[in-house]
């Protein structure tokens, strides 16, 4: 299974030669460094550890600095393991060219944190009646109507209650690759990806759609030529 680390740049839109607008997410994918090789003989599974995005060496402990020194690279901020991704050696680089337009990928990131929220925003519950006493008293408009059966004498685990919304691990599956820009280390995906701008993302080959489709032909303004998706 192929995989790489990236950072969300933002969203935009592209047009096909038929004039159809496609909402796209732009992801910065620098060269990833293989910082560890995990073998089945030693660790009971096969994987490689990838690292990306430099960080000041003064912010790392000496054991961490030594770990990156084995791969002959500077300390990195973002580190992840990818199972069953073989064929690479310690210190080797992995870039965006491992993917091609038409392939599908799964993108994992941390969703935007929205702070403390009520049940209506957090769980899409219905708002109470705005008349006949619904504005106050025993059942205010934006309050949960019931917390459970009277015979339970307790609130059962998992009841929808107010609390923190967002800032959790989210995976969007089967996003189509529209364009691969090797020169600028960019990956353009159809649709949205989790998280705010500048947030880190893990990009892997899609589990549910392993077969690629024909690349989309993009329109270029002031030109009669189509964009070559390479």
Curated annotation (Swiss-Prot):
It holds the Pfam family Ribosomal_L3. GO terms for molecular function: rRNA binding; structural constituent of ribosome. Transmembrane segments: none annotated. SUPFAM superfamilies: Translation proteins. One of its GO terms (biological process) is translation. GO terms for cellular component: cytosolic large ribosomal subunit. The keyword Ribonucleoprotein applies. Residues 125-149, 210-230 are annotated as: Disordered. It comes from the Bacteria. InterPro entries: Ribosomal_uL3, Ribosomal_uL3_bac/org-type, Ribosomal_uL3_CS, Transl_B-barrel_sf. Keywords: Ribonucleoprotein, Ribosomal protein, RNA-binding, rRNA-binding. Belongs to the universal ribosomal protein uL3 family. Part of the 50S ribosomal subunit. Forms a cluster with proteins L14 and L19. One of the primary rRNA binding proteins, it binds directly near the 3'-end of the 23S rRNA, where it nucleates assembly of the 50S subunit. This is Large ribosomal subunit protein uL3. It comes from Mesomycoplasma hyopneumoniae (strain 7448).
């Amino acid at each position: 299974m192929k995989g790489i680390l990236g950072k969300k740049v933002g969203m935009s839109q592209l047009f096909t030669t038929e004039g159809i607008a496609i909402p796209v997410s732009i992801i910065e994918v620098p060269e990833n460094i293989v910082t560890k090789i995990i073998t089945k003989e030693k660790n009971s599974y096969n994987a490689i550890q990838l690292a990306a995005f430099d960080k000041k060496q003064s912010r790392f402990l000496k054991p961490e600095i030594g770990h990156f020194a084995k791969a002959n690279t500077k300390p990195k901020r973002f580190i992840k393991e990818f199972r069953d991704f073989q064929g690479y050696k310690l210190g080797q680089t992995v870039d965006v060219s491992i993917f091609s337009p038409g392939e599908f990928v799964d993108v994992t990131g941390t969703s935007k944190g929205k702070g403390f929220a009520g049940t209506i925003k957090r769980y899409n519950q219905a708002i109470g009646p705005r008349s006949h006493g619904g504005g106050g008293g025993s059942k205010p408009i934006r309050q949960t109507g019931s917390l459970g059966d009277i015979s339970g004498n307790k609130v059962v685990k998992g009841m929808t209650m107010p609390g923190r919304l967002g800032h959790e691990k989210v995976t969007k599956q089967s996003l189509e690759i529209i364009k691969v820009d090797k020169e600028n280390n960019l990956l353009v995906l159809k649709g949205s990806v989790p998280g705010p701008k500048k947030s880190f993302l893990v990009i892997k080959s899609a589990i549910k759609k392993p077969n690629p489709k024909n690349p989309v032909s993009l329109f270029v303004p002031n030109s009669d030529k189509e964009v070559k998706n390479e």
